[in-house]
Amino acid sequence: MCRAVAGVTRFVFTLALGVGSAHVTHAMKKKTSVSEQPEQRTYEVRTFGCQMNVHDSERLSGLLEDSGYQPAANGEEPDVLVFNTCAVRENADNRLYGTLAMVKPMKDRNPGMQIAVGGCMAQKDKDAVVDRAPWVDVVFGTHNIGSLPTLLERSAHNQRAEVEILDSLEEFPSVLPAKRESAYSGWVSVSVGCNNTCTFCIVPSLRGKEQDRRPGEILAEVQALVDQGVQEVTLLGQNVNAYGVNFADEDLPRDRGAFAKLLRACGEIEGLERLRFTSPHPAEFTDDVIDAMAETPNVCPQLHMPLQSGSDRILKEMRRSYRSKKFLGILDKVRERIPHAAITTDIIVGFPGETEEDFQATLDVVEKARFSCAFTFQYSPRPGTPAATMPDQIPKAVVQERYERLIALQERIQAEDNKELVGTTQELLVQETGGRKDAQRHRMSGRARDGRLVHFTPSEDVRPGDIVEVTITDARPFFLIADGPLVNHRLTKAGDMSGAGQTPTTAPIGVSLGVPTIGIKPQADATAAPKNVHEGCGCD
């Protein structure tokens, strides 16, 4: 790919991972021809699911803007509406098709409008999406998000639906441009896919086997973000601490210590103030990663470590490859090296065959672990997973009752631990959004270095992306409050960009580093896509 920006020509090498066979079907339908469509078309991306989907949506937005589309103004109907979907839980099906039914009147009002469905649900359902929602124009999967502009053009030209699902990854998403959501915080993928075989999880069948990016490409993308003022980067992967086992570049040797080395290398990037990662797998979490976290100043004192169940018997049925003793041992090691680390987790309630004794084991581990936050899920059978056909599926009423007990326990723990932070000083990266009542109470919100959400009373010149220090005055289970005067306020480049309505647009990054550009958001009454609906995945 070759692209010129500001007089600089960028040559980007695309990593070829092999193109799987494409499953393509066509459904004839009436459309407005290309010649009748306006020259400058608008788009909106709606995201359902995990952080990987949020980052993929940044790529989709970058692709569309690179192809001449503009973000639709807030409240206006777009010419192209893209759904980036999730398939992890059962209600994902109902949510997608219910939403598609709701937007059909929009399509009826504007026959030239195009609707595209991508992501995990599209990868799973393929042409069934068009069967169930014939007004959909394009269906694309997790392996070929770069095909979206071409599929939209082809569908409009041929006046028929285009469904293209690849069986394996076409190219790393990093070779695509990205319209970043935030001026101060960014996602960077270290890998795609997953080699684990958890019996409840559909993700490996939809995302494929793990493929790891070259370290230099990851560092180049982080540097490109930091050069544009981004202060916080989160490294993304289905199992980040398996990084280095399956490099897509066959010339790179297998390296089980690669993730710890990557953390340390990110620590050398000047201007990167906060580094996070998600999600590791307890079975492969090693001491060298803990050491790298403790010894690299910009790595935040936060760890997301999925538990899923505290019962060793259920963990075995889940095919999780660790037991509760090992899990708690990891937490002990982390807290020994990083005493104030905030540890979060995922837990599934009601896995097939879970007895009251099994559930009590989960409660016991939660009590001992004292998570700062737990993303809890009621087990949802997914067709095609081993757990979906296991005997002894738990009645919904039983699952609900256990779920409520777990929530009550975790809220108590969070309330107790958060109260201990009252009176402490916390450094916050100010967010654009945070609390539902921020405007009503004249507050802003930010994240502490350990990831806790803090609502605070700002001075007049505080902007999203700035760094402030506050004194905690009160605590709730899910957030902290700082209602006193600011201890300190540091203006930042990210704050300047936020104030100007700007976010980075990073160029494709292959072997060489692309030169990032600056994307201008619409004014205050026009919010750029994508619009995200975040749902924790619970599949790590």
UniProtKB/Swiss-Prot annotation:
Residues where [4Fe-4S] cluster 1 binds: 50, 86, 120
Subcellular location: Cytoplasm
CDD domains: Radical_SAM (cd01335)
GO MF annotation: an example: 4 iron, 4 sulfur cluster binding
Cellular component per GO, a single term: cytosol
Cofactor(s) needed for function: [4Fe-4S] cluster
Keyword terms of this UniProt record: 4Fe-4S, Cytoplasm, Iron, Iron-sulfur, Metal-binding, S-adenosyl-L-methionine, Transferase, tRNA processing
Domain Radical SAM core residues, every copy: 180-416
Binding site for [4Fe-4S] cluster 2: 194, 198, 201
Catalytic reaction annotation: N(6)-dimethylallyladenosine(37) in tRNA + (sulfur carrier)-SH + AH2 + 2 S-adenosyl-L-methionine = 2-methylsulfanyl-N(6)-dimethylallyladenosine(37) in tRNA + (sulfur carrier)-H + 5'-deoxyadenosine + L-methionine + A + S-adenosyl-L-homocysteine + 2 H(+)
Domain TRAM stretches: 419-486
Cofactor binding: number and manner: Binds 2 [4Fe-4S] clusters. One cluster is coordinated with 3 cysteines and an exchangeable S-adenosyl-L-methionine.
EC number annotated for this UniProt entry: 2.8.4.3
Role description: Catalyzes the methylthiolation of N6-(dimethylallyl)adenosine (i(6)A), leading to the formation of 2-methylthio-N6-(dimethylallyl)adenosine (ms(2)i(6)A) at position 37 in tRNAs that read codons beginning with uridine.
Description of how the protein assembles with itself and partners: Monomer.
PANTHER family, per database record: CDK5 REGULATORY SUBUNIT-ASSOCIATED PROTEIN 1 (PTHR43020), MITOCHONDRIAL TRNA METHYLTHIOTRANSFERASE CDK5RAP1 (PTHR43020:SF2)
NCBIfam families with a match to the protein in the record: miaB-methiolase, MiaB/RimO family radical SAM methylthiotransferase
Recorded family membership: Belongs to the methylthiotransferase family. MiaB subfamily.
Record's protein name: tRNA-2-methylthio-N(6)-dimethylallyladenosine synthase
Source organism of the structure: Corynebacterium urealyticum (strain ATCC 43042 / DSM 7109)
Source taxonomy: Bacteria, Bacillati, Actinomycetota, Actinomycetes, Mycobacteriales
